[in-house]
Amino acid sequence: LFQDVKTAACRAALESPTLSGHCAGMDVHPAIRHAPDPDHPGWWSWDFADDGKFHAVVGKLLVRADGPGRATCRMFPEERHSNLGDMIHGGAILTFIDMALFAGGRLAGANVIRAVTLDLSTRFLSRGRIGVPLDAEVELLRETKRLAFFAGRVVQEGALIAHFTGALRKASTDS
């Protein structure tokens, strides 16, 4: 079920104007619905079949491959994501970044669907507004047999909200 993305095929897909930057035929995960989003051209859904899990707190999540080793994830902050100052709660942004490591990491070419977060370091630089899409730009820095390393930034309408680095540890195939 969890096959590596073919780099050459992914690059060809990224260069295809008809695929809107998505790696066609990519194995994602059977529990994730991944299809073009009709309301957001060029973006693909990243919806979980089981809405009873923690990831449902983020709400609608979209993804877009931006080139080899790069992807962008988008969330739509709602009132339920706000803090007492009516801005996006830092915990909501951290949850979004964690999910972006997996979704964006997968579209960036990393085989990280069966992985756990090993490290996530985030620096908040500005506040995020409710009702305005929030993007996490993810870059795959390095991938080994057991680890994947990322860096990225969270932006809202071009303004830098946060930057982050993270590492995911892939599940062992021995057990």
Where do the protein language model's features map onto the residues?
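Terminal targeting signals and extreme-terminal segments of soluble enzymes
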Residues: 10, 16-175
